[in-house]
């Protein structure tokens, strides 16, 4: 009688493979979740830092060129107090920075451009009401990350000296 060669896996071998794969999956899943969370957090931090620095730099440069007698602090409709500044610069251009929702806009004469879409709060104030040549600018940016969390970066208040 011929002996038949049966090829295949036994039930025990399959159960061992399933058990090993289950253990590996259980160990790798949290690692992948943590890696994704870290990557998105780092990406959000980099984005909001860049947005905040660029926006603050552009606002500071423009405010330095303002005619101090033309500076008006107000708020855009339905926005936080003192979230808008408008003035005329030394060349006679009308300049305005304002918050609308989570966006920061710059208006230069009639041209409006978005500076950042990650704005949480911006405020323009005179720290010393007797000196209209010094203005404080405070700004908070925020970006959503992984699993509904958010990362916020608050820049400290920067004082800007109006040169004109």
Give the predicted meaning of each segment:
Residues 5, 89, 145:
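Acidic surface patches and DE-rich sequence motifs
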Residues 46-47, 53, 70, 114, ...:
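Residue-level preference for alpha-helix termini and adjacent loops
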Residues 72-131:
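Type IV pilin-like appendage domain
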Residues 2, 9-57:
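Aliphatic-rich helix starts adjacent to a transmembrane/signal segment
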């Amino acid at each position: 009688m011929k002996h038949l060669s049966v090829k295949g896996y036994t039930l025990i071998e399959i159960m061992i493979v399933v058990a090993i794969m289950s253990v590996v999956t259980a160990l790798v899943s949290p690692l992948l979740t943590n890696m994704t969370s870290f990557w998105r957090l780092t990406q959000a931090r980099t984005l909001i830092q860049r947005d905040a620095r660029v926006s603050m730099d552009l606002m500071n440069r423009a405010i330095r060129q303002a005619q101090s007698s033309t500076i008006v602090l107000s708020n855009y409709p339905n926005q936080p107090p003192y979230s808008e500044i408008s003035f005329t610069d030394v060349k006679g251009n009308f300049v305005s920075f304002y918050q609308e929702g989570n966006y920061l806009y710059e208006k230069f004469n009639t041209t409006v451009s978005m500076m950042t879409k990650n704005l949480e709060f911006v405020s323009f104030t005179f720290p010393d009401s007797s000196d209209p040549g010094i203005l404080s600018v405070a700004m908070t940016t925020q970006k959503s990350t992984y699993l509904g969390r958010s990362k916020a970066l608050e820049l400290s208040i920067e004082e800007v000296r109006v040169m004109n």
